[in-house]
């Protein structure tokens, strides 16, 4: 049987795990860990030759290819947004599928056998459109998504594996790159029950990065008179530096942001040099952290518990490593957070545990009881939303309600399904609609039409409408505007497989070209800036000729490019080594100058490569605002007059 893996499909970075020997184990990427400690940056790019790059290779080249690099596609899941890259259009599902395909491939290399199924996590506040889009992405990537579970639930599962016999209530504070989820759970006797969930799909580490970026850009504008926000390449470098500084300041009190040659004007090149302290960082991100408070308070209120009832606080997501975030959560709840769960790995490990239970690799009596995060209902006469399944209802679940016709001799009704907390239909998220037709003509209020909602363990919704008089029925699985048809999914899956084959063939060539371009940048910087006054004319000409030969061979086969690149590297190494030895012999003053030259040779390429794992893109999908009170029950007599639906069919009215 093919392995079932658990995947944390994140906004900035993704992670995956698999159960081995009864325990969840993190799956490494082929390239190893990267910025932030996760294996798979959620970055997709297309090279100038049209080659697909995913994960760390895509992140590394983003600084030189920002227009063809896509980040934070998760924030657009469930929407009709189109990404443009490499001269083509891509849906969010496709971009996410490339990431999942990369994870699948590296997982197979790690476990040494095929991986065909997966449990994928989503933010608790993802609506049905976003969940279905995530499932579609898995299908395109060649994965059978056996279950979609909420990220906080997965984290709780990882936390409770060895404590499942204890009765306790825990609060999971899941603060990721793009979303915030706060979940209150009750655990005991192997049962994990979600009591409530609250959150914000437009709040995350990305917003922190933006605050830091804005500060750096503003500081540089004031000092140098240059607006870096107008230069996409420079802004990408600033974004990476901002994320790096944010991570470093979780463990140190200050850090330096150094970006040489970030810009230039008539006076010459300009360097960005800025010292950022933890105090300044906390000042910048303080308002963002404060926006988490309502979600914590709402989750506690919905679960009908006070902070004193909470036994454990579990922190999930990269931003929760920040001392300011830990201090904030502690001040709101009155409790210190647990340290036994790695915030960057907990979600993937929890997903792997659930995958292991499904595959039979984990012997456990664990029962996972999730909830629906938003109220589900239908549109009725007057544009009023009639709720059927209230938010925080444990799933899987089923609920039905009887409605009637709104006008005499009505022969059809339109069932419009919505998700959200607002009393008016138009203020909620539309999930889809369908018609029940061929109803026998009858006075209004006589027909009895049963509308039934079924939600499976993945949170996917099926809706049925039945005329109880004739037993005629119509049903749908919610088809959102962003959901793909089976034919579209199959085509995209074939495209993904095609990309995989091409990527495998061209991988060596692309990596060699990236390596060559990076070293050319280093060599040019050495002879034009760092060592310009320290090398002989003959040495300068020699390196320039080597650079020219490498540039001319960039688009040629590896067997032509590799020797030229190795030759250039040898030349640069010989010259910088010679200069270092001379400087060392001249004493401390000369040694300092030689060290600078050697450091520039070894490190300049690192400044030019890499891209941030976060994006400031808008969040995809919208959660409805809080309800001002439940919709009142109406008798049949209140269904006065026809009011056509979007397709001209009258809407149902509430039954007496």
From Swiss-Prot:
The keyword Signal does not apply. Residues 590-656 are annotated as: Disordered. It comes from Cenarchaeum symbiosum (strain A). InterPro entries: ATPase_NBD, Chaperone_DnaK, Heat_shock_70_CS, HSP70_C_sf, HSP70_peptide-bd_sf, Hsp_70_fam. Gene3D superfamilies: 1.20.1270.10, 3.30.420.40, Actin, Chain A, domain 4 (3.90.640.10), Substrate Binding Domain Of DNAk, Chain A, domain 1 (2.60.34.10). The lineage of its organism: Archaea, Nitrososphaerota, Candidatus Cenarchaeales, Candidatus Cenarchaeaceae, Candidatus Cenarchaeum. Residues 606-621 have a biased composition (Low complexity). Residues 590-605, 622-635 have a biased composition (Gly residues). NCBIfam families: PRK00290.1 (NF001413), prok_dnaK (TIGR02350). Belongs to the heat shock protein 70 family. Acts as a chaperone. GO terms for molecular function: ATP binding; ATP-dependent protein folding chaperone; unfolded protein binding. This is Chaperone protein DnaK. It comes from the Archaea. Keywords: ATP-binding, Chaperone, Nucleotide-binding.
